[in-house]
């Protein structure tokens, strides 16, 4: 047994092997130690025959190399979203178009005036690059960016209501994804929650009766990821603004999803609509219905925005150059009515007729391919969702295809597709692919994935 154990190569010898030199020692060392330990166990337990051991020794380098490649593969990989959920939170929310990326890439590849005033030759603020366009679009006095809307909520509460009361309706104490709850955020911001009204009904008098010397703010939160129906009432933001002004308090509307108003989305409030009432502060997301990068956008009165800029938290919550450039390009597309540059808007605006045609073309490609005999394919009507915690009561008539593999169970089929980056849905014994959320080039990749799965 000892001579067999001595036949195992030394760790240092393997680390120095030409086939493994491309990998870091920190990656290789645990893989080598683990593999050698397994071989030692097999030798000591007489699990391997001499011939099997010889084969295992010859395979050490290829096995270690394969494991090292797997260990160093990026975990963030591209996938195809065939779920029909446009702003898919788990798949990165809104997608940026090639046109937007082409516009901002030259800036990312060079130095630029992120915080530099060319005219004065002095340092400037990074927030100036989007302030003008936001003020022009919404008629507000000033604007500020942070890294997401949750950061906007935290910054606003901490700046204006630390150790003071924030009045809010019980029906608006929402929780969004990742267990982000308004009451918990208030606690983190050192604000005191003053909840008024009932879960289903809150009247203006409920807010007014709660105002006292400790009150700093009346906050309204948009119920963006759920819908109350029936015996319900919530106060309009116009009423909240007037009440806050009457009592010299700050009114703040956390709009969340950030619908600009470019699409008719039933009764979903838009930023433009709310800005007509001149709120003190309003915040919303950049990567939901706006269709841009992940940012939190704060707009409102210049005096209040100036105070936000002096909060030390802003340094920890500030946006980077990519987000600023991407938002600026997205907003310019809105200004110029170039909605085709914003994939989120384009996908939500597809008509059922366009989607049916797209689904029929995909079916035709599959039936004309070498895997046609392995599948049953049908064009079917579907219902897409906006996603991103937005307009939960709305679905969009869509089309897609159903796939049923003749020699695979549906769960195994779905797993195989997912492993290669095709994210789909299961209905009964069939895989559903909603074509609404397919991007340019996705159909070609779908054909490759289906071919790989069904020909193996």
Swiss-Prot record:
Stored Pfam families: SelA
Catalytic activity, as annotated: L-seryl-tRNA(Sec) + selenophosphate + H(+) = L-selenocysteinyl-tRNA(Sec) + phosphate
Protein's recorded name: L-seryl-tRNA(Sec) selenium transferase
InterPro entries: PyrdxlP-dep_Trfase, PyrdxlP-dep_Trfase_major, SelA-like, SelA_trans
Top-level class of the enzyme under EC nomenclature: transferase
Organism: Helicobacter hepaticus (strain ATCC 51449 / 3B1)
Protein localization: Cytoplasm
Transferase listed as a keyword: yes
Keywords of the record: Cytoplasm, Protein biosynthesis, Pyridoxal phosphate, Selenium, Transferase
Cofactor: pyridoxal 5'-phosphate
EC number: 2.9.1.1
Recorded family membership: Belongs to the SelA family.
Gene3D superfamilies hit by this protein: 3.90.1150.180, Type I PLP-dependent aspartate aminotransferase-like (Major domain)
GO terms, molecular function: L-seryl-tRNA(Sec) selenium transferase activity
Gene Ontology annotations for the cellular component aspect, listed alphabetically: cytoplasm
Keyword Disulfide bond: no
Stated role: Converts seryl-tRNA(Sec) to selenocysteinyl-tRNA(Sec) required for selenoprotein biosynthesis.
This protein's pathway: Aminoacyl-tRNA biosynthesis; selenocysteinyl-tRNA(Sec) biosynthesis; selenocysteinyl-tRNA(Sec) from L-seryl-tRNA(Sec) (bacterial route): step 1/1
Post-translational modification N6-(pyridoxal phosphate)lysine, affected residues: 288
One biological process term in Gene Ontology: selenocysteine incorporation
């Amino acid at each position: 047994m000892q001579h067999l154990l001595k036949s195992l190569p030394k760790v240092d010898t393997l680390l120095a092997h030409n086939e493994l030199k491309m990998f870091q020692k920190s990656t290789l060392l645990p893989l080598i130690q683990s593999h050698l330990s397994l071989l030692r166990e097999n030798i000591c337990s007489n699990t391997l025959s001499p011939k099997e051991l010889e084969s295992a020794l010859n395979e050490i380098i290829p096995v270690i190399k394969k494991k090292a490649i797997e260990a160093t593969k990026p975990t963030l990989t591209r996938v195809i979203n065939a779920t029909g959920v446009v702003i898919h939170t788990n798949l990165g929310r809104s997608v940026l178009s090639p046109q937007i990326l082409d516009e901002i890439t030259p800036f990312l590849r060079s130095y630029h005036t992120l915080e530099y005033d060319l005219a004065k030759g002095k340092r400037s603020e990074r927030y100036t690059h989007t302030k003008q366009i936001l003020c022009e679009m919404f008629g507000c006095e000033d604007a500020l960016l942070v890294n997401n809307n949750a950061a906007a909520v935290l910054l606003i509460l901490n700046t204006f209501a630390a150790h003071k009361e924030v009045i809010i309706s019980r029906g608006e104490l929402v929780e969004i994804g990742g267990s982000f709850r308004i009451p918990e955020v208030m606690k983190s911001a050192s604000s005191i929650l003053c909840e008024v009204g009932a879960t289903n009904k809150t009247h203006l008098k409920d807010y007014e009766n709660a105002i006292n010397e400790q009150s700093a703010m009346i906050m309204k939160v948009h119920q963006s990821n759920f819908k109350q129906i029936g015996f319900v009432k919530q106060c309009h933001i116009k009423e909240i603004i007037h009440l806050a002004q009457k009592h010299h308090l700050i009114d703040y509307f956390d709009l969340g999803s950030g619908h600009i108003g470019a699409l008719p989305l039933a009764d979903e409030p838009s930023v433009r609509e709310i800005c007509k009432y001149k709120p003190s502060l309003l915040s919303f997301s950049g990567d939901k219905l706006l269709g841009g990068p992940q940012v939190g956008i704060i707009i409102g009165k210049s005096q209040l925005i100036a105070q936000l800029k002096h909060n030390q938290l802003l340094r920890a919550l500030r946006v980077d150059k990519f987000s600023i450039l991407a938002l600026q390009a997205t907003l310019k597309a809105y200004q110029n009515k170039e909605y085709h540059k914003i994939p989120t808007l384009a996908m939500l605006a597809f008509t059922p007729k366009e989607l049916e045609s797209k689904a029929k073309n995909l079916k035709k490609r599959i039936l004309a391919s070498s895997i046609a005999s392995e599948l049953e394919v049908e064009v079917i009507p579907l219902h897409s969702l906006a996603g991103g915690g937005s307009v939960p009561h709305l679905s969009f008539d869509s089309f897609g295809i159903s796939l049923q593999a003749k020699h695979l169970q549906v769960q195994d089929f779905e797993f195989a597709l997912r492993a290669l980056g095709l994210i789909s849905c299961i209905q009964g014994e069939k895989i559903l692919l909603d074509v609404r959320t397919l991007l340019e080039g996705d159909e070609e990749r779908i054909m490759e994935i289906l071919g790989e799965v069904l020909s193996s």
